[in-house]
Amino acid sequence: MIRKLFIVLLLLLVTIEEARMSSLSFLNIEKTEILFFTKTEETILVSSSYENKRPNSSHLFVKIEDPKILQMVNVAKKISSDATNFTINLVTDEEGETNVTIQLWDSEGRQERLIEEIKNVKVKVLKQKDSLLQAPMHIDRNILMLILPLILLNKCAFGCKIELQLFQTVWKRPLPVILGAVTQFFLMPFCGFLLSQIVALPEAQAFGVVMTCTCPGGGGGYLFALLLDGDFTLAILMTCTSTLLALIMMPVNSYIYSRILGLSGTFHIPVSKIVSTLLFILVPVSIGIVIKHRIPEKASFLERIIRPLSFILMFVGIYLTFTVGLVFLKTDNLEVILLGLLVPALGLLFGYSFAKVCTLPLPVCKTVAIESGMLNSFLALAVIQLSFPQSKANLASVAPFTVAMCSGCEMLLIILVYKAKKRCIFFLQDKRKRNFLI
């Protein structure tokens, strides 16, 4: 009888101990929602706080749902004073999605006991041999060789339309430039941070959104200013000014928001790319100004082709952005797409509202809005690629490409609506004139 009671008591104690163990969480993995793999060889780092009398008694078991997509090579184990770290080495085969289950087991003699299990860690495998900075090289070289002279010619044509007197006016009354700078470097980064926290983006993606929002004006803002009857001379001046300010404000914002997001490390600002962007605008525009004063007949020809050329470049730019960013669309989730739509829309709204409150002329209001909403997102891409390891950089780079694509689509929609409205007004006015004459 005593022996039976002892056995029952022993089983009860074991059951209580197992229940206590199952209620604890020993495994710690950096991210359990979704993992993006782009290289042939990848690793998953798992930390275990489980302790036993024998340190080597615990081990990991990894179960992969689809071995055609992902295969495990081995699991390396490293014991430290406060935790046991496991490195799961994997190789990727095909593109696709699969689920990974990770189990922590404890060996006691010939018996094994399941301590904890992390189920259904989703893994997306995207074959991408090159880095994102090399991605544009996959675009047809013939298109690039054709588009580059057209861009330079277009900037030169803008130089022919510039009135130098306007520079003096802006210098005396720099309010539009100040409004654009405040919106771009203070309000937009804060909005990007706030939105990324609301939708609970991972730290790397949130930083990508913030860096996109702290970029200077660009993205063909002067093209859209011309097509929407804004002040394109002011747009060029605002782009150049904000690009210069980016040399100071991008490092400041990257430091502030990386610390808030808990990201450590050194963030590299692509100074050479910022300067080259500035020169890429100033040199052809300056040539256009010289042509206007030295060869007026050539300048008048360039002014005539500027609108059709701007339309062509706008469509080609959207096409190239989608071509380069296609790989990122595969990794986009609903939250990132939503932010991609909101960021340019908020920039346009803030810029236009502030300019309207300051009672600026309508063309100036349009220009401030465009320069605040159309950001040079590819500078953010350069910052991310230079600052993060490749796996984290791929995740963070989704935001700049998504914002660039959404910006182009939104501006195209605005231009089409604006042109349609303008044509309807012209048609109605023409009809009224005819009725009046009759």
Swiss-Prot record:
One of its GO terms (cellular component) is membrane. This is Sodium/bile acid cotransporter 5. It comes from Homo sapiens (Human). GO terms for molecular function: bile acid:sodium symporter activity. Its main location: membrane. The keyword Flavoprotein does not apply. InterPro entries: BilAc:Na_symport/Acr3, Bilac:Na_transpt, Na+/solute_symporter_sf. Glycans are attached at residues 56, 85, 99. GO terms for biological process: bile acid and bile salt transport. Belongs to the bile acid:sodium symporter (BASS) (TC 2.A.28) family.
